[in-house]
Amino acid sequence: MVSAIVVAGGKGKRMGTVQSKQYLSLNGKPILYYTIKSFLDCKLVDNIILVVPSHEIDYCEKEILEKNSLKVNKIVAGGDERYDSVYNGLIEAKGSDIVLIHDGVRPFVSKETIENAIKYSEEYGAAAPGVMPKDTIKIIDDNRFSIDTPNRSHLISVQTPQAFKFDLIYDCHKKIKNENVNITDDTMVAEYFGNKVYIYPGEYTNIKITTPEDLIIGEYLVNR
């Protein structure tokens, strides 16, 4: 069984909005609508688990799912940190062979990217899409002076869905709760315990909508 965990616990801080960014409108539909529909449209995904803040569960059921005729298998309350939310989703995904973990504000993930996540995680145990940065990347010191320029050919901007054999990522998430480490995504959780993650080619259109500028790009993409 293949399960997709859609993590939709983001706030509107960088977006500058009161409303959580996953509920902002793109062409008359909430961002989260497009994200969920992407997984519903992929026949290889058997199970969809939506993780949202506990106080938003009722809103999400009525305003996102019911109003837009969407169905998920389970809505789960998130935790204080992102990895807590993912772990809550993983508990509901027990029995899965493969689990995909996806940002709720990446609405333009393609069917091909989802299918490749499944394929490569089955082969390698852990996989994620990524794209090469278009800009030169600098490492700066605390005073914002450039101190190094990494070789761009070895740099990747990692996206989601990040896919894993279930037992691998579940065991890692159970253990990471006892570690004092700053975790920003699930590939880091896997890598922290010595697992290799295969990075396959992603798509530049698979953007994470975080800022007002992203919303403008999103409006263009949804109307292509």
Swiss-Prot record:
Gene Ontology terms: biological process: isopentenyl diphosphate biosynthetic process, methylerythritol 4-phosphate pathway
EC id: 2.7.7.60
Pathway as given in its UniProt record: Isoprenoid biosynthesis; isopentenyl diphosphate biosynthesis via DXP pathway; isopentenyl diphosphate from 1-deoxy-D-xylulose 5-phosphate: step 2/6
Keyword Plastid: no
Entry GO MF terms: 2-C-methyl-D-erythritol 4-phosphate cytidylyltransferase activity
Annotated keywords: Isoprene biosynthesis, Nucleotidyltransferase, Transferase
Annotated catalysed reactions: 2-C-methyl-D-erythritol 4-phosphate + CTP + H(+) = 4-CDP-2-C-methyl-D-erythritol + diphosphate
Residues annotated as site: Transition state stabilizer: R14, K21
CDD domains registered for this protein in UniProt: CDP-ME_synthetase
Site for Positions MEP for the nucleophilic attack, residues: R152, K208
InterPro entries, per the entry: IspD, IspD/TarI, IspD/TarI_cytidylyltransf_bact, ISPD_synthase_CS, Nucleotide-diphossugar_trans
Pfam families for this protein: IspD
The protein's enzyme class: transferase
Role this protein plays: Catalyzes the formation of 4-diphosphocytidyl-2-C-methyl-D-erythritol from CTP and 2-C-methyl-D-erythritol 4-phosphate (MEP).
Family the entry assigns: Belongs to the IspD/TarI cytidylyltransferase family. IspD subfamily.
Descriptive protein name: 2-C-methyl-D-erythritol 4-phosphate cytidylyltransferase
